[in-house]
Amino acid sequence: MKFFKRHWILVVVSLVLAACGPTPTPLVITKEVEKEVVVTKEVEVEKVVEVTPTPIGGELILYACLLDPDKLQVIFSTFKAQNGVNVTCLDMGSGEALERIRAEKDNPQGDVLFGTTNLSHVNLAQDYLTEPYKGVGWNLLPEGVVKDRDGRWTGFYYGVIGFACSPERLEEIGAECPTSWQDLLDPVYAGEVVIASPAASGTAYTTLSGLAQLLGEDEAFEFWKQMDANVAQYTESGDAPGELAAAGEFAVGISFAHDIQLQQDKGLPVILNFPEEGTSFEIGGISIIKGSKNEAAAQAWVDFVFSEAFQRYHNDVAHRLPVVPGVGLAEGSVGLEDVTLIEGYDPTEWAAKRDDLVVRWQEEIGTQR
C-alpha cells in the first residue's frame, strides 16, 4: 500500500507540524495571532494560548460530532481561543440530524451540520434548509462533486466503504475475510454480517447507492435481499458494524474504512479489506443551518475546518481523508488511490435519489425482517 506526503501552505493558516512522538510536540499556528498547542500522540492538550483582536463570542451548536469528546475538545479549545465562541456538539447519526433540522425549521436550535455524508447536505439544500456560504473552503475547492454550486454545503473530507473482519470469529466459522461483494452471499457468513440501516445511516446509504451504481438498481436490491439472509442485525449508526466486528461479536462489519482504522488504533484485532469489484465513497460535508442564531460563528467554524491545521489533525486522529490540496496523509491512512472505486459513482447524484431508494429498501427489505 502506498502513501504520500505533500507540503502545502494555506493562505488562511500557516502550520508547522512535527511528527508526534512519546513527548509532546508543539503545533504552531500563526496568522495575526500567536498560538501554541502541545499535542501528544494520545492527543492531549497541555497548553493553548491565543489572542485575537476581534472575537465573535456567543454559542455555537453543532449537529453530528464525528469525533469522540476528548478529540473534539482539542478543536473546540483552539476555535474558542481564536474566536471567543463556546462550541457544543450534539452527537447523532445523519438520519436523526435530517429529521431534527426539518422538525426545527421554524425555530432552528442548531447552527451547523458538521459532518455526515454529503448526501444529507444535498437533501437539506434541496429543501432550502441550509444557508449559502461561499467561504474559504468553497473558494479553495474545484467545481464538481465536492461542493454545492450555490454554497449551501461544502465537502471537507473523504471516506471509503470497507469490510471489518474479526479474525477470531472467522476462525470459528472456518472462513476468510471477504474481498468482494459476492463473498458476502456465501452461506458461511450466515448470521455473521452486520451493517447499518440505509434508513438511519448515511454510511449504509453510501453502500446501497454504490451497489446500485455497480450493479444497477434492481440488481442491487436483489443482491441485498440475498445478503440479508446473512445479516445478523441492522444498526442505527454507521460505525457500529466496525466496532462489533472489532469486538469479535460478528465476523464481518461493513463501515467506512476510517471508522475501522480507529478500532485498529485501539489495538483491537480487526482486518480491513476492500471489495475488489469496487467500493463507494462519501464526501463528508458541512453546512450552515438556515436560521442559525449565530451565523458569524457558524461561518467562522466552516472556514476553520478548511485550515490546514484542522485538516491535518482530523486525518491524524480520525483517518478521514483531507480535501485541502497538499495536506499529506497520516501514517496508516488509506488514500483514494489505494482502493478500487466504483466507476462513475457520484455521491451527489445519488443523494437526489436517497428518499426513493430508502423507501424501496424499507418496503422490500427492512419491513420483511
Feature map (PLM): residue ranges:
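Periplasmic-binding protein-like
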Residues: 140-143, 159, 188-196, 223-228, 234-235, 304-328, ...
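Bacterial signal peptide processing site
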Residues: 21-24
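A ligand-binding cleft/hinge motif common to bilobed small-molecule-binding domains
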Residues: 119-123, 246, 250-269, 318
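Short alpha-helix C-terminal cap/hinge motif
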Residues: 74-88
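A bilobed periplasmic-binding-protein/Venus flytrap-type ligand-binding module shared by bacterial periplasmic
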Residues: 164-169, 209, 282-294, 313-314
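Extracytoplasmic ligand-binding site segments that recognize negatively charged/polar headgroups
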Residues: 61-73, 88, 92-96, 108-249
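C-terminal motif of bacterial Sec signal peptides marking the signal peptidase cleavage site
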Residues: 17-19
